[in-house]
Amino acid sequence: MNYKTFLAMCLATALCSCTNTDYKKEFTNIIDEISSPQYYGRSDYANGDINAAKYIIDYISDIEGITPMASELTTPTPAYPPYKSAVKPASEGRWNDIDNADKYLPYLQHFQIPMNVMKGDMAVSIDGKALRPTFDFTAKEFSPSCHGTYPIQSVPDSIVTNEHFINYLNSGKLAGKFAVINMAKYCTLPAHPFERYKPYLCLIDSTKVGGIILKSDELIPYFKARSYFTTPVPVIGVDKSFPEDAQNITINIDSKFLPNHDCHNIIAYLPGTDMGTDVITLIAHYDHLGLMGRDNIFYGSNDNASGTAMLCVLAKYFSTHRPKCNLQFIWLDAEEANLLGAFYYCQNPTIPLENVKLVINLDMIADDGDHLATECSENGMSELEIIKQINDNNDDYKPFNIAIQELTDNSDHYAFDQAGVPSIYFSTEGSFLKDYHSPRDSNSNYSADNFNRLFSLITSYIKMK
């Protein structure tokens, strides 16, 4: 049997299976569930993250052949990824208070990280005019609490240099004031691209500066990647509409630093038919940004309830269409906190990493259009070529425009690449990308139009292995 004939058979099988079973409907049902308000952006607020994990485990534990696989090969040890927080082993944490916890614990890998959270007030006004959170301003994730009214003073671009910047901020000229800084100019300061804020903003003397306003052409989205520390003063982002003649800021922001926030990867396993040791690992992060103030929930339908849902339905599909190779499914926590769940897993794997022939990371896959953003490790390129051939020879669906980009630390595959594991990342990019890291990434703003062809692409590839 030649390659194209075998490929056609794989595609036909995937298409038939996808047609006969409504995996697409299950895909959207899962997204809609774990992106609903009661999960609070899959954060620790009201145990939204725990409840999301319970939902995932309830789903996969009903799948025949799926087994838990959260026992590490050795005694767990901390991970120390560069330019990120340390990630330490932990106990069950909040799971100790969950009913029927024994059902869930075998699937869970526990770890802990420091995290600054914002669950209370989130209000900013300029000269008496209220700014809208996530539209007109965002709070940087490392900001401490702040309540009061302060004068505003702009910092000249000429001051924003390595020689003058911190000395000027701490000179006393800005005592009790919020300093407006041109973000584009700030980004020219010497710093590692993974750690642009900490080397400068953590040096600020809070008795000499009241706070920082970073002004950019477009509003900086909300992140959690740098929530493992706090700066001495609050930092907010605004866009170019921020008035040049602003005089005063009234700010009410509540934050709380959690030195030992408990997190939990979910790990499951499906043995293949050849009884070998080779494994394909499918990953997706199930956490999201949670809250930026009590009234601003980041629901995360596309990012990344979509990848979470795809892993669930792939597990169900392969339970009745067993491939030759073994499959591992990992729903990772703390991706938004700088990929820390993935780094912890790579430090404490549940199967030897050398047995993993490929990691496929699905992150933000509920967008429309034909663009399939792809990143691939050097040692995964041969597998990507196979996937590209499947894509290009698919007579049942229009091929994706597979756009290969530089591999960066933008999602969990990066941690596996750094551990030497062949890794591929997929993300669909279309009209809903504009809602990235905002409360608008919700159940009203995602698309399942690409589900069938991405499902077919992944299942066809795995059937060939």
Show where each model-derived region lies.
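Second-shell loop/turn segments in exported
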Residues: 37-47, 112, 154-155, 184-194, ...
